[in-house]
Amino acid sequence: TVATKLITFLLVPLYTYYLSTKEFGITDMSLTVISLVLPIASMSISDAVLRFVIDDSNDQKSVVSYGLIVIGLSCAIVALLLPVLKLSVFGGLGNYSGYFLLMYVSTALMTYAGNVARGLNQIKIIPICASISTLITGISAYLLIVRQGIGIQGYFISVSAGPLVGTAIYTIV
């Protein structure tokens, strides 16, 4: 949505002003690694669930359940691989491996929940959850990075909090 893009656009100056160059590089590395690892570790289950929920309306519950199990397994796989982030090629991301895992889990769940909603034809809830998720991310980034001054930890918490709230809304609705 336009609101989501606007808030995301407004967060970039906040990040560049309050995070050091190294910290900003680590945040960028985390986004890059997650965008590469998520489809591999989860075997793109979010896309598969979308397809099979649409194709097989009689077995939607089991498809969604199996997909959630795969997402859980992907989170476990990423947790087991966290020591790899200590390699110098990841530019210090290993120092924030717990935060990285939280970010991975929240991103995986939000992506999965969005595709399940799309597959179940709950299209109206998708922009609502995306907007609320982005709003929570923006507010928490401001509170944690600017007001509390906790830097990169605040970044990781804020970019995890938004999707977790969005996922919770998908689950409730």
At which residue positions do the language-model features occur?
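Alpha-helical transmembrane segments of multi-pass membrane proteins
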Residues: 36, 40, 72, 76, ...
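Signature of the first transmembrane helix
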Residues: 1-46, 138
